């Protein structure tokens, strides 16, 4: 029970630190958590927590790249502001490629992955600002491209 309470305290402190939007590296987050009294925290634990809570690196008001948590922790929807992060949607013979604002690709890919094969998406690979999407077996790349354009209400 005590470990559960410690874990909850760690999560609470972690989220509070990320809301400050001033940490540009995992090492800085480790140091801040150690200063908060979590002596056993290390970089790999911070990395797992960043992934678990969907944290991304984005620019803060000072235009510095920092870690932050997404506004919503559920699966994003196309009615959320995420569609505003999509800058370009294009395709070739094999893949659909989406370019996003820096740090937004993984969130957009998560949305697309949640739609799945029924919507024509076999899978996605996301970097910082680029997503590769491969069509499911019964869809052409062009059909997938058109469906994604409709999804994000864009005429690109």
From Swiss-Prot:
MF term (GO), any: arginine binding
Functional summary from the UniProt entry: Regulates arginine biosynthesis genes.
Pathway annotation: Amino-acid biosynthesis; L-arginine biosynthesis [regulation]
Organism lineage string: Bacteria, Pseudomonadati, Pseudomonadota, Gammaproteobacteria, Enterobacterales
Protein name: Arginine repressor
Family statement drawn from the similarity comment of this UniProt entry: Belongs to the ArgR family.
Xref: InterPro entries: Arg_repress (IPR001669), Arg_repress_C (IPR020899), Arg_repress_C_sf (IPR036251), Arg_repress_DNA-bd (IPR020900), WH-like_DNA-bd_sf (IPR036388), WH_DNA-bd_sf (IPR036390)
BP terms from Gene Ontology: L-arginine biosynthetic process; protein complex oligomerization; regulation of arginine biosynthetic process
Source superkingdom: Bacteria
Keyword Secreted found: no
GO cellular component terms attached to this protein's record: cytoplasm
Residue ranges crossing the lipid bilayer per the database entry: none
Organism: Erwinia tasmaniensis (strain DSM 17950 / CFBP 7177 / CIP 109463 / NCPPB 4357 / Et1/99)
UniProt keyword list: Amino-acid biosynthesis, Arginine biosynthesis, Cytoplasm, DNA-binding, Repressor, Transcription, Transcription regulation
């Amino acid at each position: 029970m005590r470990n559960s309470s410690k874990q909850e305290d760690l999560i609470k402190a972690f989220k509070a630190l990320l809301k400050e939007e001033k940490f540009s590296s995992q090492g800085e987050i480790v140091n801040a958590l150690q200063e908060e009294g979590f002596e056993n925290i290390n970089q790999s634990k911070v990395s797992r927590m960043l992934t678990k809570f969907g944290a991304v690196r984005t620019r803060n008001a000072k235009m510095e790249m920092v870690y932050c948590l997404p506004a919503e922790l559920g699966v994003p929807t196309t009615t959320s502001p995420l569609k505003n992060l999509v800058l370009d949607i294009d395709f070739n013979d094999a893949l659909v490629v989406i370019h996003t604002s820096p740090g937004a690709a993984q969130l957009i890919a998560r949305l697309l992955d949640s739609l799945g094969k029924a919507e024509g998406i076999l899978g996605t690979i996301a970097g910082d600002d680029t997503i590769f999407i491969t069509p499911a077996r019964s869809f052409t790349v062009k059909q997938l491209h058109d469906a994604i354009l409709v999804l994000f209400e864009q005429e690109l």
